[in-house]
Design a protein with these regions (language model features):
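Patatin-like phospholipase
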Residues: 32-123, 138-438
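N-terminal secretory signal peptides that target proteins for export/translocation
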Residues: 1-13
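Intrinsically disordered, low-complexity terminal tails and inter-domain linkers enriched
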Residues: 10-14, 427-430
Length: 438
């Protein structure tokens, strides 16, 4: 067992190494070159298009004529695919963010198919992990096996590769540029394997039938939500459609700082630029059509049903927080995201009331208390998938309101007004006279 004096050389060695590291950091700082990035200016923001694919994206915070037109066209396409008629009920599905908790939504969808009551959705939207499952939810029960595979067989190594601690340290002190703690090449490869030419062709086919698939990303420079018309991209025939389709899915699921952003080649005016896009959950944890489509008037007087799957627990969960920077920061961010997600559920409820949609909400139940041991814990995801599956195949009791919402008088419809009395030709009130047709 070495005595105390013998430990001192090790301490001196550590100090020497730290001194060398500091000198190296200063040396590197003088010669590092940032990766070229040429974003459009704010003045050009509303002119930005994907080269060769105009009208396939829109800002989520303002009306979009291209998405509005796509909605109108969807009615004619639906009629053409349905012998000139519109379905009496139209269904929408909104899939939220939640990382590995997306296993819950995958389980709900697969169990719903097993129950035999899962409808065909005219509109499917996805944010973050919801964006990864949205194309397969859109294509229906035939792709349940893909959903199950994606959320029950993967682990951390299938999604990301962490950078070395030294690289992260150099990035933190702004010496060596690094866009994130990890590289997401594994996730890109997973998406490329799951979304092939066949999937793209089937999304295009359903788009031509009047159905719509939308995914949201965050344009990081603009601090705005971008809504992508995925069916229009799939149906475009553009040789780069598949590459773009996959990139959008990855971008929507790229949590800033943990995953690197995705860069999109765009054009505006006479110039070519790059846009930086990250997780759609930065702007909203779940979306419908936001403000890109005016208050819903498309489709006549048919019944509309909106189903929302929130891949997260919505009620507070007690956890003893260690008085350390990492634990306090992690708990604060988790609480912020949970609060934002609840606010988004209320926002969609407001849209539902405005646009006459019946609101149905599913979320991870309180009694699911298993803790994950990593960012993508296979055992945890399998357990959560099974929870969602069992709930749905037994007839899931969808919640009609956002969490803790007390409808009170807000939901109480006034009694119908009595019919005004009929008056005779002499102006006196008399019984209603019914005339038989001739």
């Amino acid at each position: 067992m070495p005595n105390t004096p013998e430990k001192l050389p090790h301490c001196r060695t550590s100090l020497t190494l730290l001194s060398c590291l500091a000198a190296l950091m200063l040396l590197i700082q003088g010669c590092v070159t940032l990766k070229p990035y040429n974003p459009p200016t704010a003045a050009l923001a509303d002119e930005v298009q994907i080269p060769g694919l105009p009208g396939v994206r829109a800002w989520g915070d303002r009306p979009s004529e291209s998405l509005q037109q796509s909605g109108r066209e969807s009615l004619e396409e639906e009629k053409a695919a349905n012998h000139g008629k519109l379905e009496p009920v139209t269904y929408g599905l909104a899939l939220s963010g939640g990382g590995q908790d997306g296993a819950f939504g995958a389980g709900i969808l697969c169990g719903w198919s097993q129950a035999g009551t899962r409808p065909q959705f005219k509109l499917v939207t996805g944010i973050s992990t919801g964006a990864l499952m949205a194309p397969f939810a859109f294509l229906g029960p035939a792709y349940d096996h893909t959903l199950k595979e994606a959320y029950t067989t993967i682990s951390d190594k299938d999604i990301y590769k962490a950078h070395k601690p030294l690289a992260i340290l150099l990035a933190v002190v702004n010496v060596k540029p690094l866009p994130a703690l990890t590289e997401n090449k594994p996730m890109e490869e997973l998406v490329a394997r799951l979304v092939d030419d066949k999937v793209l062709a089937e999304v295009a086919r359903e788009h031509r039938k009047g159905r719509r698939l939308l995914i949201g990303t965050t344009q990081m420079d603009a601090q705005r939500l971008v809504i992508w018309n995925m069916g229009a991209i799939a149906n475009s025939g553009n040789p780069k459609a598949l590459e773009l389709f996959r990139k959008i899915m990855v971008a929507s699921a790229s949590i800033p700082a943990f995953f690197p952003p995705q860069y999109f080649e765009v054009e505006a005016g006479a110039g070519r630029y790059q846009e930086m896009h990250g997780d759609g959950g930065v702007m909203t944890e779940v979306m419908l059509y936001e403000n890109a489509i005016k208050p819903f008037s498309i489709g006549g007087e048919r019944k509309r049903e909106l189903y929302i799957i929130r891949n997260e627990q919505v009620y507070p969960q007690w956890k003893k927080v260690k008085p350390q920077l990492k634990d306090i920061a992690s708990r604060a961010v988790d609480s912020l995201l949970k609060s934002q997600g609840i606010g988004d559920l209320y926002r969609l409820y407001t849209y539902a009331k405005r646009d006459d949609l019946d609101y149905h909400l599913a979320f991870i139940p309180k009694d699911f208390t298993m803790k994950s041991t990593s960012e993508f814990d296979t055992a945890y995801m399998n357990a959560l998938f099974q929870v969602g599956y069992n709930m749905a195949c037994c007839g899931y009791p969808w919640t009609k309101y956002p969490p803790d919402f007390n409808p009170g008088k807000y939901e109480q419809k006034p009694p119908p007004a009595p019919n005004p009395p009929l008056r005779s030709s002499a102006g006196e009130t008399g019984p209603e006279t019914r005339h038989s047709p001739h």
